[in-house]
Amino acid sequence: MKTETRTEIEAAVFRRLVNHLDSRKDVQNLDLMNLSGFCRNCLAKWYSAEAVDRGEEITVDSAKEIVYGMTYGEWKDRYQK
C-alpha cells in the first residue's frame, strides 16, 4: 500500500471515530477511559502532540474543539453527567 493511501485511510478512520464518538454523547469520558484506556481528551492531546511534532502549533484546547465539535466547556455543560 502506498504511504499516501495509508495516510488517507488513517485520516478517514480518525474522522469516523470522532463522528462515532460525537453520535454517542451518552458515553462519558470516564466510561471510555475505564473500558478502553483512552477518551476524547486523550484523542485531543494526541492530535495536538502530533501537530506540534510536525511544526504546527495546535493547542490542546483547539484540538478538543476538533474532537468535541465545540469547546470542551460547552460539551461538559451539555453532556457531562
Feature roles, as predicted:
Residues 1-81:
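Domain-level signature for proteins that mediate thiol-based redox and metal-cofactor handling
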